[in-house]
Amino acid sequence: LEKTVSILLLIALLFLAACKGKSAKDGPEEYSPEYQETPSTEEPAQNDSSRHSGLDLKELKAYQYNWSESDDLPPLVIVIDDFGQISGQLLEDFTALPQEVAFAILPDLPNTQAAARLADKTGHEVLIHVPMQPLGNDNPGKRYIKKGMEAADIADLLQEFYSQMPNAIAANNHMGSAATADYSVMQAVLEELHELGLFFLDSATTNKSAVPSAASALGYKTAKRDIFLDVPDNSDATLIGKIQSLGKYKGRNEPIVIITHCHTREKLNALNKFIAQISDMGLKLIPPSKLYKKLSPPA
């Protein structure tokens, strides 16, 4: 009996450990689990043959999509989140992407300023990837915008983040399902970003975002993420699904906004494949600065 109890306790502990590592979604399927926004460690260096190997687009090209080049699809904006931690060859390889692809850089990290300088040097626009309070227990960083903060404290923090990447042209939220749902917080955020001459891209980690209402009250144009490219994974099946989903934006005037992440070379390879396929299908990329010009005035 004692042995049976021990085995049952061990099974229960293993089950609890497995559950602890999981993170719940904030909303419907189109909203990302916030662990997707958690920086990971830099992957080990790989040899040159692996790094520069050709892309296998066979599966992506073979699929019969529900749209074609003749359809009236808007251009795409691609933003890569979570720069600031990775460095070395992986970072350099991300800069080899088309210049229209933008880098969203986390503040207060070892490679924050180096990533901002390298992005600027290689022609990529920079966004401040502002850490914000999530609903769950994920850690957004040492300093982040949270519910209950005074407007002056929010302004000071945003100014400090901006000083680390003064070439930034916009900002988007890192995590933030709690903070972006708070009207007073987002009003203070948008007011300060306006003072800094930056526009805001809502990463849409919650379906209860207060950004539209706060922006409307201020007469401030904002953008919203449409697609997370690397959710749930970086497989060809996922990429095909994302490309297929572009068809629902036929006839829309505003560009399609796509976010992915820089954590691993697998994500870089998937992004390269996605760009190669949609380019072959006639879609164009534009940088976030051109996105802003195409945004509709707030309602």
Show where each model-derived region lies.
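Alpha-helical scaffold elements lining the catalytic groove of polysaccharide deacetylases
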Residues: 141-163, 179-185, 212-250
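C-terminal domain-boundary segment and adjacent tail
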Residues: 193-206, 265-299
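Catalytic beta/alpha-barrel core
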Residues: 79-83, 102-108, 150, 172-182, ...
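C-terminal motif of bacterial Sec signal peptides marking the signal peptidase cleavage site
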Residues: 15-18
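Hydrophobic faces of well-ordered beta-strands that scaffold small-molecule active sites
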Residues: 76-81, 99-105, 124-130, 169-173, ...
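Bacterial lipoprotein signal-peptidase II cleavage site
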Residues: 20-28
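Active-site beta->alpha N-cap acidic-glycine motif
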Residues: 63-139
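Sec-dependent signal peptide recognition
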Residues: 2-10
